């Protein structure tokens, strides 16, 4: 990853880093798979004639998203793709568990909630202290899934409100869960032994564009 005042500067820095990595891998006889690499420009601007970078002489394909440590980073960092992928993962897992926690299951509500918290909830909670700064429309991708699962767990009729279900079952809304994780994340960063990590809390941008929410705002 490289930053710059413009696309040419950042691409030039990225190419220098790629060359250094390629030389290091050659000296240690490590084979790189260029086809699994992607080139993403993280910016709100529309870029035409994007400069390309190469790895071992092969052009790295341009893409509008990249996967890193289980997170899907899109070019505009609005997290929509990330939550859509998480929703698909949740739907697949829920289909496998429906016989156990669905409307027709004889399992107690307590055990159904326990299963949801232990199996399904960690899927969307992973990295939520960072991706939670997405706009509400994207967070609703997960919230609507949680609403559906809770309704199935208690076999709720159509006239029962989702807010009542969350209150009675003592399940936090997605936005409340985000704030809880964000506070813990902020506390860990402020006490981190690594100066680079702790500086993430102190060095906040002075210019805020488009009223975007930063991860540090959530805590």
Give the role of each language-model region.
Residues 198-219:
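C-terminal helix/juxtamembrane-tail motif
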Residues 16, 23, 30-65:
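Short, conserved micro-motifs composed of acidic
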Residues 1-23, 44, 77-79:
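Catalytic palm subdomain of template-directed nucleic-acid polymerases
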Residues 7-10, 79, 83, 105-112, ...:
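Residue-level recognition of alpha-helical structural elements
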Residues 58-130:
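Basic, alpha-helical interaction scaffolds
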Residues 11-14, 18, 32, 83, ...:
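Hydrophobic packing residues in well-ordered alpha-helices of helical domains and bundles
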Residues 22-33, 38-40, 114-115, 130, ...:
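Short, charged alpha-helical motifs in flexible N/C-terminal segments and linkers
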